[in-house]
Structure formats: structure tokens, C-alpha cells
């Protein structure tokens, strides 16, 4: 392990000890924001510091074993020292690799729940139908992960599917797996309404955003205009007779969110505020990305809605992810929620890129 890395790990270990001490401070316990920040930092440090402590112990065992081999005459003790030396050399090599991977930059949002928005884009009715197919695909994938999914807002398409659907997925490390789904999903297939059997290309866009808490995204009440109105149901069914639907406008950004599917006006306001925090976060991220150097563009994609990320070719039962060049000839299985192969490939590509960037920095 190089000296810079070792020094950084020593600093992390000291920082963790300081955080543990601070978390016992009464003033910090009263400050929810500070308490939350420290707990988050503690969680980020604990695992790597634990591995570093293991690494240092293994290094000490190597020193002890070498000392025995240099000074001991007893053959039995020498044999035991050789075994210990081999075991701890392997351990040090393994721990060094694990620690270096842990030290790669992490996405602070990876542990978060997500809000997903799917829109039917180019292709009219067929795009809306495909948006519905994507929603079903994500629902099925969520089931395999034991995640919970909840529709927040939906505009049903005239021929089926959705012109727009917004839903939340809650569970373990949802954003870390679904963040790469953001972008334009292109479908090539023969629409059911196409009498001549011609293949049509349509597009649905997906935006995957981390759920943001009130602590992370602070929105002032005087920056909001809140309107209430009567909720409308499909075909006039189950329409509320009270003004339970909520529309919130964020005046500084002009962002508008609505919710009408909650059980009460209070529920709808909570849902709308959750969506608003996420939308404000998205606007801030887009602003930062626009200001960033274009040459530093992420290899696995920008996450922009307009970026074509995947093509679903129904006649050939083929799906291609254009960011990693992965093609699977089992579209039928993918649409049943079997998207892990794409997710794993994209995570690996992100990891590979981070390692390359870190090596570049080390050589500077």
C-alpha cells in the first residue's frame, strides 16, 4: 500500500473516532441536520476503517512471523511461522484490493429510494403503450428485489399505456441499481393497429431520481403556491367530491407537481412535496452538469432523458444497451423484469471508469 493511501486511511480512522465522540454530545443530538450528517459520515467510514484495522493487524502478524523465522531454532515453530506468513501475505493482498475499491468515489445517493418518471415520447400511442410495458418491467424487477412500488401520478394513454407515469420504489439500495435506467428507451416492433405489419420505432423516456429528504433539500413555504381542486378519475369513476387533489408550484424555478391519488388532501400534499423536492434536486443537478466540462462526460452515460441508452427489438427478440455495447437475445425475459445483466454490466463499467480516473490522478 502506498504512503498516501495509508496516510489517508489513518486520517479516516481518527475522523471516525472523533465522530463517535461527537455523536455523544448533547448539542449535536439536538441538531437534527448535524446529527444526520455525522451518522451518514460514520456509516461511510466504518466499513473501510474496519478493513484498515484488519490490514494493520495482518501486517503486524507478518512482522512477527518474519522475526520468528530470523531468530527461532525450533523447527516446529518455524513451520508454524511459515504458514502464518503465507496466510497473512494473502490476507494483506486481498485487503489492500478491497480497501482500494472502497476508496473509489461513491455516489452519495446509492442507498436512497427513487422516484421514477416514464413518458411516452416519439411515436404517439405506441410510445405510450411502451411506457406501460416499461412500468410493468420495473414492477416485476422490483418484486425480485423485495422492493415496494407505489404509483404517485399517472396519465393514461388513449390506446393504453401511459403518456406519463410517476412512481416511487422503496427498498435496499434502489438508486444504486436503477440510476442507469435514466434516458431514452427505443422500441422497434409492429404495432397491434398496424394492418400491413410494418415495424415502427417509438421512444419512451425514463428519469430515475433519488428521493430527497427535507434535510437535504430545503424548500421555503413562502416559495410555494399551493392550489387544491377536485380529483378526476378515469372515465368519471371514483371521483372525489371534495378538493383533495393538490397542485404545488415552486415559484423560484417554476416547477409544478400535482397529486390526486392519495386518500386525503394531506396525503396528496405529502406526495406532491416528495415529488417537488426530487424535481428541484433534478433541476440543480442538470444545472451543475451543464456547467461541467463536456470532456468529463461519464462513460456510462449522462442520465439525460434525451440520451438514447437502449433499443428493444421485438421482431428479433433482442435488447441492446448502447453504453456498454451489451446485446441480449432474450427480450421476452427482459420485459419480464430480468434486467440484472444490464445493471451489473453498467455498475462494472462505472467501477472500471472510477479505477481508471483514480490511476490517472495518482500518476499526475
Curated annotation (Swiss-Prot):
Post-translational modification (record): Methylated by PrmC. Methylation increases the termination efficiency of RF1.
InterPro entries: PCRF (IPR005139), Pep_chain_release_fac_I (IPR000352), Pep_chain_release_fac_I_sf (IPR045853), Prokaryotic/Mito_RF (IPR050057), RF-1 (IPR004373)
GO cellular component: cytoplasm
Entry annotated with the keyword Cytoplasm: yes
Keyword Protein biosynthesis: yes
Residue positions, PTM N5-methylglutamine: 237
Record's keyword terms, sorted: Cytoplasm, Methylation, Protein biosynthesis
Predominant subcellular localization, coarse grouping: cytoplasm
Pfam annotation, one family: RF-1
GO molecular function, one term: translation release factor activity, codon specific
Cellular compartments annotated: Cytoplasm
Family: Belongs to the prokaryotic/mitochondrial release factor family.
Annotated function: Peptide chain release factor 1 directs the termination of translation in response to the peptide chain termination codons UAG and UAA.
Matching NCBIfam families: prfA, PRK00591.1
Protein name: Peptide chain release factor 1
Organism: Mycoplasma mycoides subsp. mycoides SC (strain CCUG 32753 / NCTC 10114 / PG1)
Amino acid at each position: 500500500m502506498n504512503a498516501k493511501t495509508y496516510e489517508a486511511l489513518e486520517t479516516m480512522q481518527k475522523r471516525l473516532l472523533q465522530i463517535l465522540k461527537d455523536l455523544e454530545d448533547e448539542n449535536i443530538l439536538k441538531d437534527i441536520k448535524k446529527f444526520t450528517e455525522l451518522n451518514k459520515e460514520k456509516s461511510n467510514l466504518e466499513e473501510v476503517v474496519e478493513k484498515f484495522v484488519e490490514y494493520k493487524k495482518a501486517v503486524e502478524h507478518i512482522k512477527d512471523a518474519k522475526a520468528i523465522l530470523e531468530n527461532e531454532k525450533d523447527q516446529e515453530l518455524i513451520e508454524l511461522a511459515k504458514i502464518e506468513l503465507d496466510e497473512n501475505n494473502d490476507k494483506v493482498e486481498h485487503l489492500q484490493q478491497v480497501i482500494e475499491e472502497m476508496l473509489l468515489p461513491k455516489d452519495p445517493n446509492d442507498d436512497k429510494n427513487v422516484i421514477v418518471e416514464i413518458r411516452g415520447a416519439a411515436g404517439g400511442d405506441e410510445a405510450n403503450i411502451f411506457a406501460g410495458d416499461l412500468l410493468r418491467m420495473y414492477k416485476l424487477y422490483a418484486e425480485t428485489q423485495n422492493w415496494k412500488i407505489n404509483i404517485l401520478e399517472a396519465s393514461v394513454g388513449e390506446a393504453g399505456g401511459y403518456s406519463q407515469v410517476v412512481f416511487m420504489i422503496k427498498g435496499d439500495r434502489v438508486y444504486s441499481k436503477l440510476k442507469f435506467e435514466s434516458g431514452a428507451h427505443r422500441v422497434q416492433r409492429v404495432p397491434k393497429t398496424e394492418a400491413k405489419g410494418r415495424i415502427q420505432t417509438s421512444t419512451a423516456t425514463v428519469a430515475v431520481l433519488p428521493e430527497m429528504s427535507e434535510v437535504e433539500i430545503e424548500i421555503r413555504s413562502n416559495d410555494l403556491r399551493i392550489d387544491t381542486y377536485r380529483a378526476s378519475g378515469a372515465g368519471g369513476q371514483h371521483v372525489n367530491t371534495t378538493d383533495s387533489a393538490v397542485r404545488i408550484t415552486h415559484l423560484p424555478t417554476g416547477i409544478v407537481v400535482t397529486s390526486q391519488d392519495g386518500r386525503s388532501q394531506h396525503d396528496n400534499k405529502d406526495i406532491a412535496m416528495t415529488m417537488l423536492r426530487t424535481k428541484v434536486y433534478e433541476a440543480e443537478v442538470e444545472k451543475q452538469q451543464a456547467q461541467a466540462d463536456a470532456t468529463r462526460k461519464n462513460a456510462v452515460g449522462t442520465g439525460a432523458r434525451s440520451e438514447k441508452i437502449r433499443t428493444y427489438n421485438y421482431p428479433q427478440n433482442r435488447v441492446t444497451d448502447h453504453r456498454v455495447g451489451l446485446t441480449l437475445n432474450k427480450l421476452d425475459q427482459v420485459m419480464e423484469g430480468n434486467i440484472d445483466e444490464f445493471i451489473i454490466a453498467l455498475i462494472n463499467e462505472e467501477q472500471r471508469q472510477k479505477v481508471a480516473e483514480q490511476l490517472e490522478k495518482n500518476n499526475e
